[in-house]
């Protein structure tokens, strides 16, 4: 299981990676492993400004649908269009090609309130 140090984590198993004034958001390796085979990603918030912990979409696996929560407040700029035809990218490369949305955070310093790799690893190993 991967715990990259270049991202921050939430207790709901999302990750965020800030690159300049934008950020990428996805689900963690632990989350995709627990969910199983992802069959559909539904993101309907593109162009909207959301608050931290608001639902920005859902992810569907064979037996359930799970909400996806925004790690920090910001505008949803783009969804990963590749997931429409290849939702399994979330399983195969959760921190790379399997990213879910690109956002413009209201305050990039909010990321500092999230878990680092060691904190997240401790959370999932409880």
Swiss-Prot record:
Primary role: The glycine cleavage system catalyzes the degradation of glycine. The H protein shuttles the methylamine group of glycine from the P protein to the T protein.
Entry-linked HAMAP family: GcvH
Gene3D superfamilies: 2.40.50.100
PANTHER family: GLYCINE CLEAVAGE SYSTEM H PROTEIN, GLYCINE CLEAVAGE SYSTEM H PROTEIN-RELATED
Organism, scientific name: Phocaeicola vulgatus (strain ATCC 8482 / DSM 1447 / JCM 5826 / CCUG 4940 / NBRC 14291 / NCTC 11154) (Bacteroides vulgatus)
Disulphide bond pairs: none
GO biological process: glycine decarboxylation via glycine cleavage system
Domain Lipoyl-binding span(s) in chain numbering: 22-104
This protein's name: Glycine cleavage system H protein
SUPFAM superfamilies named among the record's database cross-references: Single hybrid motif
Pfam families per UniProt: GCV_H
Record PTM N6-lipoyllysine, positions in chain: 63
Top-level taxonomic group: Bacteria
Reported cofactor(s): (R)-lipoate
GO cellular component term, pick one: glycine cleavage complex
């Amino acid at each position: 299981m991967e715990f990259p140090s270049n991202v921050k984590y939430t207790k709901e198993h999302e990750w965020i990676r800030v690159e300049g004034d934008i950020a990428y958001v996805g689900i963690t390796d632990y989350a995709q492993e627990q969910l199983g085979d992802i069959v559909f990603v539904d993101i309907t918030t593109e162009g909207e400004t959301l608050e931290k912990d608001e639902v920005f979409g859902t992810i569907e696996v064979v037996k359930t649908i799970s909400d996806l929560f925004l790690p920090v407040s910001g505008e949803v700029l783009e969804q990963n269009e590749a997931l429409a035809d290849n939702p399994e990218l979330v399983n195969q490369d959760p921190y790379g090609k399997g990213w879910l949305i690109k956002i413009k955070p209201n305050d990039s310093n909010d990321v500092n309130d999230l878990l680092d790799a060691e904190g997240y690893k401790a959370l999932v190993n409880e």
